[in-house]
A protein has these predicted regions:
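Short, small-residue alpha-helix embedded
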Residues: 295-308, 473
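Conserved cytochrome P450 K-helix E-x-x-R motif and the immediately C-terminal K′/meander segment
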Residues: 4-20, 334-374
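C-terminal helix/juxtamembrane-tail motif
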Residues: 501-516
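Cytochrome P450 I-helix active-site segment
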Residues: 309-361, 379-382, 419
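Conserved cytochrome P450 K-helix/beta-meander segment immediately N-terminal to the heme-binding cysteine loop
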Residues: 387-440
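Cytochrome P450 heme-binding "Cys pocket" and the immediately downstream C-terminal segment
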Residues: 153, 311-313, 446-449, 455-459, ...
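N-terminal membrane-proximal hinge/A-helix region immediately C-terminal to the signal-anchor transmembrane segment
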Residues: 1-76, 81, 85, 108-113, ...
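Cytochrome P450 heme-thiolate monooxygenase catalytic core
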Residues: 62-64, 102-300
Length: 516
């Protein structure tokens, strides 16, 4: 394993090879030294059952250890009182009111900022491709900054890049060996840099043979201590500003303000003094940026990679968007936020879901007590890793006898399976709308299994927010640009598995559509 994964950086690929080798929906592999073996589960029905209905499973220590650079962030906690406390702080942030009135407008403005930046880059590149991975990271982080912190936090990730690009001449751009244009990178504020460094450390810990040992070494380094101090200092300053605004208006607006109000209400209910300065809340606030960074930017990168490779799907998506926002298309303008969110576009949903399906990372749960999976004994403390890129997800499922399933899993029905489950095909998510007078399709979220966000009570907390950002960015990019073909060596980047399945590069060759 070490030899292969050190070269490919694709642990999930190695795991699914073990499943294919044994041709069994349940097998065990030894991954971490001096630890129990992992149990690999390659069956979406049983995986769904474990995540949603089985109380004998909880957050895996693979995740709690892997996310340890985030310190007290809720995603690395076992289910218990402290996890419930932190989740209660976040209760308002996924409400329709907050998403529609706060997140939506700032995400739209942020996406348009990215569009304008790419228009400048497109002119400078003069028909050549350029890597947008960093741009997508910066844009995702700026989106979070704009509603977690107050607008008075003037620092952004994309801003310095825009300023730097505005001052360069096309003749000064470096050109890579494959004809790609290389734009210079500008330094960012120390808080933003600290967030990126935390993400890098998560990647190191997750991929280490012994995550706990790797994290112990990281904690001893001056750089980690500096990063932690910077994050907590900036968050503390923002919390103090939020408290002052709440005293003046008593009306929460930003994410921090909503969290502080929730802590105040909880303290009143429990007859205690509100603890606004605790490190758990500080780490939770900083963790919001990190959790929403690579997850959305990585999905966007893969989406644009597929749309570049598959021009017919790109055209079909653009046609669907033009039809959904027909007034904006007829008036040759960019649709407004209200127009983009007025109705769901089935084909857009299908494109996003297909990207998530093909690049989901495996989900792990840990047995809280001795239990069984598919008739096999699972001892307490065992990590069960649900393979997201194997049989049942990227290939036809194994035939499992009902007698081997749990009582709740027996009642579950399977999904539509085809021989091309490794192929990017959004149409697999569309079904004919029942009772429609004309041939009309609708998006079926349950058409095919995918577990990119996990499922059940420990699924991704920010799922709704992520979908909102994905829809807005993809809509606006496809509306404003043609994603032209790039050379084969740029169209098929290498990738690595960590917390996310991240492409090393995302090369785009853009042509503006504003005048088309």
């Amino acid at each position: 394993m070490l030899r292969e994964v050190s070269v490919t950086r694709e642990l999930n690929v190695w795991l699914v090879k073990q499943v294919d080798k044994l041709q069994a929906p349940l097998c065990q592999v030894f991954v971490e030294p001096f630890s129990k073996p992992w149990v690999l589960l390659a069956d979406p029905i049983e995986a769904y059952d474990i995540m949603t209905r089985r109380p004998d499973f909880d957050r895996s220590n693979f995740i709690t250890d892997g996310l340890s650079p985030m310190d007290n962030f809720h995603a690395r906690m076992k289910t218990g009182p402290q996890w419930r406390t932190t989740r209660a702080w976040l209760q308002d942030l996924m409400s329709p009111t907050f998403l529609n009135n706060v997140v939506g407008p700032v995400m739209f403005d942020n996406s348009m900022n990215l569009i304008r930046f790419w228009e400048t880059k497109t002119k400078l590149a003069n028909g050549s491709a350029f890597d947008v991975n960093d741009d997508l990271d910066h844009s995702a982080l700026d989106g979070m900054l704009s509603f977690v912190f107050d607008r008075h936090f003037e620092h952004t990730a994309l801003g310095p890049q825009i300023e730097t690009i505005s001052r360069i001449a096309p003749t000064s751009l470096a050109v890579g060996p494959r004809g790609e244009v290389r734009f210079p990178r500008a330094p960012v504020h120390e808080f933003i840099s600290a967030l990126y460094e935390t993400v890098d450390k998560i990647d190191v810990v997750t991929k280490a043979m012994s995550p706990k040992l790797a994290m112990w070494f990281i904690r001893q380094t001056p750089s980690y201590k500096r990063v932690t101090a910077v994050k907590r200092q900036v968050v503390k300053e923002q919390m103090q500003g939020a408290l002052q605004r709440l005293e003046a208006t008593d009306e929460p607006r930003t994410a921090i303000e909503h969290m502080l109000v929730r802590e105040k209400k909880a303290a009143e209910k429990q007859d205690r003094k509100a603890d606004f300065g605790n490190h758990i809340m500080m780490d939770e606030i900083a963790g919001q940026f990190i959790a929403g960074l690579h997850t959305t930017s990585t999905t966007l990168a893969w989406t644009f990679i597929y749309l570049t490779r598959l021009q017919h799907i790109q055209s079909k998506l653009r046609d669907a968007l033009h039809q959904a926002c027909s007034d904006a298309h007829a008036e040759k303008r960019v649709p407004t936020l209200a127009e983009l969110t007025a109705s769901r576009v089935p084909y857009l949903e299908a494109v996003l879901e297909e990207t998530l399906r093909l690049h989901a990372t495996s989900v792990a749960r840990q047995a809280k007590r001795d239990t069984e999976v598919l008739g096999h004994r699972i001892p307490k403390g065992t990590n069960v890793v649900m393979i997201a890129n194997g049989p049942g997800f990227h290939a036809p499922a194994f035939d499992v006898e009902s007698a081997r399933r749990s009582a709740t899993a027996v009642k579950s029905k399977g999904w539509r399976e085809t021989s091309d489950m490794r192929v990017f095909d959004p149409d697999r998510w569309l079904v004919h709308k029942a009772g429609a007078a004309v041939a009309e399709v609708e998006f079926d979220a349950n058409a095919v299994p995918q577990i990119a966000f996990g499922m059940g009570p420990r699924s991704c907390w920010g799922r709704r927010m992520a979908y909102l950002e994905l829809r807005l960015v993809v809509c606006l990019v496809v509306w404003n640009f043609d994603l032209l073909d790039v050379s084969p060596e740029l169209a098929d980047p290498k990738a690595s598995y960590g917390i996310v399945h991240r492409a090393d590069q995302c090369y785009l060759r853009l042509r503006g559509r504003r005048t088309l």
